[in-house]
Each structure stands twice: as C-alpha cells, then as structure tokens.
Amino acid sequence: MASLSGLASALESYRGRDRLIRVLGYCCQLVGGVLVEQCPARSEVGTRLLVVSTQLSHCRTILRLFDDLAMFVYTKQYGLGAQEEDAFVRCVSVLGNLADQLYYPCEHVAWAADARVLHVDSSRWWTLSTTLWALSLLLGVARSLWMLLKLRQRLRSPTAPFTSPLPRGKRRAMEAQMQSEALSLLSNLADLANAVHWLPRGVLWAGRFPPWLVGLMGTISSILSMYQAARAGGQAEATTP
C-alpha cells in the first residue's frame, strides 16, 4: 500500500508523469522492436507497440511546450554559477543551461511545422533541437567525468601531516555523490547514443540503430533517472525532522 501511495504521489507531479511516460515509451519501443525483428509471428503486436511508443513520445513533445519558463527560471537562478567552487564545472554547467534553454524553442518550431501551424521545414528545426540536446548531454558527460575524477582524488589523497582524516560522515557523502555522478554519466551516455542516432545520416552512427536498440538505450537512461529521483526523494525524507 505504501508503494502504491508513493506511485500515486509521484504521478501527481509533472516530472513524475514525464518519467513514467518516458520509460513506458522506450519499453514499448524495445519490446516492439524485438518482436518485429526477431519474432515474425508476433510482428503485428510489435508494430502496435511501436505505434504506442511513437504516441507517448509525441505526448511528451507537447507537454514540453510549457517547459520554457521553468527552464528560464532555473537558468536565471543559476546565473554564471558563482556558487560553484570549480571553474570547469561552472563553465560546462552554464553552457549546458544555455543549450537546454535554446533546445525548447527549436523543438517547439519543429513541432509546429509538423502540425502545419508554421510553414517552415521541420527537419532543419528537428536537427537543430537534437544537436542542442546532444551538446547538453555531452557537457553533462564532461561534468560527471570531471566530478568523478576530483572526488576520487580527494578520497584517495594521503592525509597531510598534522591534519585529521576525512570524517566518516563526509566520506560517505562524497561516496554517495560519486555514485550519483556515475549514474548520471551512464544515463547521459545512453541518451547521447540515441541523440547521435537521430542526427542526419553521415554523422557518426546516425540512423544506424534499429528500433529495439533505441528502446534499450532509452530504457536504461529512463530507469537510471527514475532510480536517482527515488533515491533523492528518500534522502530528502530521511533528513526532514
């Protein structure tokens, strides 16, 4: 009953619904792609699952029409990252926020062109939005790698003379942060693989993924994202008096 209540509570929020729609969409694409490619007798079921996946993706695209303001507020609050101690983290975070901020209007124009609201070439705008998404993911990968390197160095650095070792609580916090960064790294890499696939042919492995592989990468990323969100929520509850 507690887990059911937790799920219902998560679905009351926009982010909770978006995560569920995302994981369901990619799971449908994964299973549908496998059935179409490997099980001819079940190809009709696979095709239907791929249609469901497409519709769920379209649903998320429409819901993102309202994300610009939230992203702008976050970008404005972060600013130039004055609260960050590390200059590299500050730089990649600011660039990532800029890429994310530009991504949304580009996707909106592409969607409006497909819906024939605007008379422009949608393919160019889809390519631009996907490129911005890939850039944001690449910056996220660079940030996570840098953070993992720095945290590992701090944990393994020998204790200087006349200084006390790291307190157990701080060490555990750093280890938890390393785990979080590792999960973010894996999630971003999985999404980056799909982002490159959706770029125009001729760019690395663009257009070469079968539907099931796109579904697999997206499912991995979605599950990791949901796990991180649940973990963060649990930690927040644990620290609440």
From Swiss-Prot:
GO terms for cellular component: peroxisomal membrane; peroxisome; protein-containing complex. It is a multi-pass membrane protein. Residues 150-211 are lumenal. The chain crosses the membrane at residues 125-149, 212-227. Its main location: membrane. It is found in: Peroxisome membrane. GO terms for biological process: peroxisome fission; regulation of peroxisome size. It comes from the Eukaryota. Residues 1-124, 228-241 are cytoplasmic. Keywords: Membrane, Peroxisome, Transmembrane, Transmembrane helix. The keyword Transmembrane helix applies. It holds the Pfam family PEX11. Promotes membrane protrusion and elongation on the peroxisomal surface. Belongs to the peroxin-11 family. PANTHER family: PEROXISOMAL BIOGENESIS FACTOR 11 (PTHR20990), PEROXISOMAL MEMBRANE PROTEIN 11C (PTHR20990:SF1). Homodimer. Heterodimer with either PEX11A or PEX11B. Interacts with FIS1. This is Peroxisomal membrane protein 11C. It comes from Homo sapiens (Human). The gene is PEX11G.
